[in-house]
Design a protein with these regions (language model features):
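Extracytoplasmic/secretory soluble proteins
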Residues: 4, 9, 13, 17, ...
Length: 518
């Protein structure tokens, strides 16, 4: 690590003799950023973090906002056309960067004590970061953002259930898929929301919210997503990559959810509904169970308190299979592809300095994450950060506050473990409820996961080429089976069809990745 940092320093000193392209006075950089669905600020530029950054650095930024639902497609068009912003912040992914490295600026020469003292200090304290952001050609094209680690982030989407409705109907908390079926039937017929209408939706989901994908409803059958790819169609056991979509338990899971759908217990519109429609369903107070970050994201305090984590259900027809839910203990929670400067930028050194300045201290980072001090956070005389919990309403929840005042993990800084905010003794119950939900299911996180490391661009392209059509087919097959059912003939045809989509080659790619063959 020290030798690597020394190399960066030597290279930067040598290149400092070369004149950098200069920007005209008063010219602004353009950064493409993520626009979160819970943000009610009216625009990134209205927030204290960006304002403070401009005041302290003198560097003006124009923020070009994309909503997460359409960002991927729009960024692909930008990359293909060459019509690029100066940088991307928290909105570009590994594939988009690695497959287009010539469009991005190698940052090595700008990472030195003079230009980026805060980043250099961070790399010295956490040398593993350098390995994580260094591509196979030896260059650093992206800088890490978000929370380095966070106990709340060990879990991903959690399955929630309205415990108050169970109590009202005299129902026990289900522990198996068959018990869950019976509970959902009772909810469908029992009018637990008390409006006199049969409008209850026992289970909903959406494919347009990272926390609420259908595939994770197959958790009782040992199948769930994992960060880094696969969408639940791949898992790892004893170091071996396994294709899940041809397993007998995969079929059993689809048959179970078709039964639920056929009886009106599963909201099949989840396969097509938007994130906004999903949130509207939740706010209608008709949903009994769904996947999400925390009920406080979707409800005012009184209704949010009715929900609790649904225990990881055991498949009644596969009792030997360990139920799983997405998550990983002590994982790195940051985004290694968080900040990427493009070749369109006339002065990369200035943008690196701007980014570095946002990593100066915990308070500066909190301005970006949570907004101005005194609303969602405060700093004591010892420099420690404490979370604040202002009163929320149904229309402006704490989650709205987070994305309206700040931007959470979509920020130009990496919050280190020692900088994370803590809750005081006077914090409300909801302050620790997310961690409680994670703790309730953490024993069911997959035992093995795909390791995260950088690979050559051509291997990323190979993986994507193999997976694009396969994923489209599998997503369609899953939706069709849940909505219309699955018989032996359909399953046998599926087993043949997946080979036509080169499923075995896709799985072998991951096996070679695990075995470090490239």
């Amino acid at each position: 690590m020290k030798r690597f940092l020394s190399l960066i320093l030597v290279l930067s000193l040598a290149l400092s003799l070369i004149a950098l392209p200069a920007m005209a006075e008063g010219e602004a950089f353009t950064i493409t950023v993520n626009l979160h669905g819970l943000d009610k600020s009216g625009g990134t530029a209205n927030k204290i973090g960006p304002k403070h950054a401009e005041e302290t650095t003198g560097i003006k930024i124009n923020y070009y906002e994309l909503d997460s639902a359409s960002a991927g497609e729009k960024i692909n068009i930008m990359l293909a056309s060459g019509d690029l912003p100066d940088a991307f912040l928290s909105i570009i992914n590994e594939t988009q960067v690695v497959s287009n490295l010539p469009l991005f600026v190698p940052l090595n020469e700008y990472l030195n004590e003079e230009n980026a003292p805060n980043l250099m200090k961070m790399f010295e304290k956490y040398p593993e970061l350098v390995d994580m952001i260094t591509q196979v050609d030896g260059n650093i094209y992206t800088l890490p953002i978000g929370d380095f680690s966070n106990p709340d982030n060990q879990g991903e989407g959690i399955q929630f259930i309205n415990k108050a409705w169970l109590d009202k109907l005299g129902l026990e908390m289900p522990t198996t898929t068959e018990e869950f079926y019976e509970v959902c039937k009772a909810i469908k017929e029992g009018d637990p929301n008390g409006n006199g209408e049969a409008d209850e939706i026992p289970v909903t989901f959406t494919q347009n919210n990272w926390a609420a994908h259908f595939i994770n409803l197959l958790g009782p059958y040992g199948i769930c997503e994992w960060e880094g790819g696969g969408d639940g169609y791949l898992k790892v056991e004893d170091g071996k990559a396994i294709f899940t979509a041809t397993l007998p338990e995969f079929r059993a899971g689809l048959e179970y959810w078709h039964r639920m759908a056929a009886e009106g217990l599963l909201d099949v519109e989840g396969f097509t509904q938007t994130n906004e429609q999903f949130y509207a369903r939740l706010k209608s107070y008709s949903v009994a169970s769904y996947r999400g970050w925390t009920p406080a994201s979707n409800f005012a305090a009184e209704q949010a308190a009715e929900f609790t984590a649904l225990p990881a259900l055991q498949a009644s027809d596969y009792p030997e299979i360990q139920s799983v839910t997405p998550g990983e203990i002590n994982r790195f929670c940051g985004n290694c592809y968080g900040f990427a400067i493009t070749r369109a930028c006339k002065d990369p050194a200035a943008l690196v300095r701007w980014f570095d300045a946002q990593n100066a201290d915990a308070a500066t980072k909190m301005l970006w994450k949570y907004g101005e001090e005194g609303k969602l956070w405060k700093q004591d005389e010892n420099g420690k950060i404490w979370a604040l919990w202002p009163e929320q309403t149904e229309d402006f929840t704490r989650e709205n506050m987070k994305y309206t005042y700040g931007a959470m993990n979509h920020i130009p800084c990496l919050i280190l473990p020692e900088e994370l905010e803590e809750n005081g003794d006077d914090a409300p119950v909801e302050a620790t409820v997310r961690l409680g939900f994670v703790n309730a299911v953490k024993d069911h996180f997959p035992a093995e996961r795909i390791p995260i490391r950088n690979v050559p661009a051509e291997k990323i392209q190979e993986r994507n080429m193999l997976y694009t059509d396969l994923k489209a087919y599998l997503d369609s097959f899953v939706a069709d089976c849940v909505v219309n059912g699955l018989d032996d003939a359909k399953w046998e045809k599926h087993l043949k069809d997946v080979e036509g989509y080169r499923a075995s080659e896709w799985v072998q790619w991951y096996q070679d990745y695990i075995d470090k063959k490239f």
